[in-house]
C-alpha cells in the first residue's frame, strides 16, 4: 500500500495484466524514448529548425564534421544485467570517490574521429587548443564544422583556424541535439566504457581509445541518417 496525507491510500506494486502485455506484443509495439525539449515548440526555435531541415536536404553529408563534448567517469558500469530466476544480479562501482574527465571529439560520415581527453570542463582556452592542434589539421577545403552554440565554442581564434583550412563553421539551432549524430556516438562509447569499468584516469584514457575504435562507417552513416542527413543515399 502507498500512503499520503494529501492523496490518501492506493495500491502499489501492481503488475500490468498479461492480456495488455500480449496485445502490445501482438501489435509489435516496444518501449520508446520520446522526450524532447519543449522549447522546440517555440516559434523562433521551430523556424530555425525548419531552416536547418532545408539545409539537411541539400548539403553533401560527406562534408560535415560534427563536434561535441561529453563527460566520462571512473565509476561507470553496466546499468542492467541478467541472472537466473530467483537470483540477484549484483555489481559494484565507486559511490563516493571517482574521477571525471571531459572528451572533445568530432565525427564524420566515414566514422573517423578526432578526440581529446582532459581534466576539467571545456573552456575557451581548451577549445581553442583542440581546434588548433587536433581538429584543424584534419580539415579539408569545403568541410563544414557543425557544433552547438555553447559559450566555450564562441571563439574567433578557433573560427580563424578552421577557415585557414578553407572550411566553415555552422551552429545548430538551439535545443536541437537531435540534429547532432555525435550524441548517438556518445551512447555507444559509454556503453563500451560501462563494460570495461575503468577505475583510474589512466585506465579510462585507454578504455576511451578502445571505445572510439569500435565506431564504424556503418555506425556513423546510420546516425547521420537517423538525424535527417540523407543526401549520401542519393
Q: Could you describe each region identified by the protein language model?
A:
Residues 1-234:
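Short functional hotspots at interaction and active-site rims
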